[in-house]
Amino acid sequence: METLKFWIMLKSKIAINIVDSIEKSLNKRKNERIYLHEPYFNKTEISLMNKCIKKNSVSTAGFYTKEFEEKIKLITKAKYATATINGTSALHLALLAIGIKKNDEILIPALNFIASANACLYVGATPHFIDIESKTLGVNFKKLKEYLSKNTKFKNGYCLNKKTKKPIRAIMIMHTFGHPNNLKDLRKIIKKFNLRCIEDAAEGLGSYYK
């Protein structure tokens, strides 16, 4: 019973630390609300949406789509940019593009939006939740390296989960609240364990790593 009480207290403390870290990361200004789980449209966005509706331009060929893609390329310095209906569909397409299929496992951070897990399920893969760190709220790569070293082996060039016997084919990180993951450690992990990488940067637009 004492052991159970200890673990409950420990988990509660961890949960409180996570919440505290999130609140600090938001860095709210006085009287400024930061919307997280509800839509928020300012006057400019409402005006642009009204223009689209009035001009009957609300499809993939809408006149703002190309402008949006060009601005994304400019901001991110990416060679290509393709707009999708939402972030979930973008993750789904990314998994298909790198050849993820049924029975593959995808590593995703435990603190996450449901889109990551859903995208894995759409292609028949299994989301494999991994630890995060309090500093960035992203993947704890130190713990991940220890975990993979202990619980996986290589077979036919793939990192194989010893317990499930399924190949771990990729890692899908998320830059939570705009805090970039430690990409230096990420590169070491994907190289050592032969993983493909997808970055969910929906919350990281405008953030840069070093």
Descriptions of predicted regions:
Residues V58-A61, K153, K210:
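Short, flexible helix-adjacent loops and helix caps
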Residues E2-A97, K101, R169, I173, ...:
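Conserved PLP-binding active-site segment in aminotransferase class I/II-type PLP enzymes
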Residues L96, I100-K192, R196-Y208:
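PLP-dependent aminotransferase-like
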